[in-house]
Regions:
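Alpha-helical transmembrane segments and their juxtamembrane interfaces
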Residues: 20-21, 123
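N-terminal signal peptide c-region/cleavage motif recognized by signal peptidases
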Residues: 23-25
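N-terminal alpha-helical modules
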Residues: 28-137
Length: 137
């Protein structure tokens, strides 16, 4: 359901944003140059900034595409988005009992690829050639 998707997106985003909110101020002083981070924490700070921007783009692209679709197409898109989120989470994060770990580089790459995918669907729909079969990819 729509509530499940929103809840999943919200919970994932809250976990990442909350982590970022605590990390960013602590590491900002040492990460002036994301080209050459001084240490792993500076690198994580830089990756988190890029991930948060990709996540924002993902939400915007999903919203843009959703506005172009009818009710049935929206349901198909939602199924595809939930499947993509499960795949991203399975491939980019894990919980080993001691904590929850996210590979930010993996999450960022998967998210950027999904943004591109959604933007391709937006272009197709704007051109009058929405392909329903691609909405749940």
């Amino acid at each position: 359901t729509t509530n499940t998707l929103k809840s999943t997106i919200r919970n994932t985003s809250i976990a990442i944003v909350t982590s970022a909110a605590f990390m960013l101020p602590m590491f900002a002083w040492g990460a002036e140059n994301c080209d050459k981070p001084n240490n792993d924490f500076d690198g994580l700070y830089c990756l988190t900034k890029v991930y948060l921007e990709a996540d924002k783009e993902l939400n915007n692209s999903y919203s843009k595409l959703s506005k172009l679709l009818n009710k049935q197409q929206k349901a198909t898109l939602k199924r595809g988005q939930l499947a993509w989120m499960r795949e991203r989470n399975d491939q980019c994060s894990y919980n080993d009992g001691d904590g929850f770990f996210v590979n930010m580089s993996c999450a960022t790459n998967k998210t950027a690829n999904r943004v591109n995918f959604l933007n391709e669907r937006v272009r197709e729909c704007n051109a009058g050639s929405c392909r329903d079969s691609r909405l749940d990819d």
